[in-house]
Regions:
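Metal-dependent phosphoesterase core characteristic of DEDDh/y 3'-5' exonuclease domains
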Residues: 2, 13-20, 33-78, 97-172
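A generic local structural motif
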Residues: 6-9, 91-94, 134-135
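Short acidic, Gly/Ser-rich segments with clustered Asp/Glu that frequently serve as metal-coordination loops
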Residues: 25-33
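Metal-dependent phosphoesterase signature
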Residues: 74-95
Length: 172
């Protein structure tokens, strides 16, 4: 019997893609409505073999740190001094929006990353384009690429181990 994976974000076909984008976010907690993104990494592999690698720390606002999980901060290696010169989310939002606008996108536990990105954009009054509206990051629009591929869901299907975290996947 084939396993079915329920995800909140659509997965799809990547056979016609000109590029594929991998991304990961590190956050201050598990709750996207209260947490801040501390770091984001985005890697785009283009069909011509070129690769675009972009990563940045993101300085959280003090109010966002009020809801931070000490365990999440420890996992991310957060300390105020190392993040002092990092940009605020709104200073790099247009870069993130442009890099993630075109599919396919890949992440491990992608629903977590997408939920945190959408919440961060919306807190800064960014919006998703209306149907048939042209995407424009300069107009404070964000769009998450499609299809979305979740390596955690794939690991659950194809690597039935006790854990599906990235450390376990690296071992196989």
């Amino acid at each position: 019997m084939k396993k079915q994976i329920a995800t909140g974000y659509k997965m799809g076909n990547i056979t016609t893609a000109k590029a594929i984008t991998f991304f990961d976010v590190e956050t201050t907690s598990l709750d996207p409505e209260k947490s801040a993104i501390l770091q984001i990494s985005i890697i785009t592999d283009w069909e011509d073999g070129n690769q675009d690698v972009w990563t940045t720390k993101i300085k959280p606002r003090d109010v966002e740190l009020n809801y931070a999980s000490s365990e999440a901060l420890k996992i991310c290696g957060y300390n105020k001094d190392d993040w002092e010169d990092a940009p605020l989310f709104e200073e790099v939002a247009h870069i993130i929006a442009k890099k993630l606008a075109w599919g396919p996108i890949v992440a491990h536990n992608i629903n977590f990353d997408i939920a945190h990105l959408k919440a961060s954009f919306k807190r800064r009054k960014w919006r998703e384009p209306e149907r048939n509206e042209k995407f424009d990051a300069e107009k404070k629009m964000f769009k998450i690429g499609y299809p979305a591929i979740d390596t955690c869901a794939l690991a659950y299907i194809y690597l039935p181990t006790e854990r599906q975290n990235l450390d376990t996947l690296r071992e196989h």
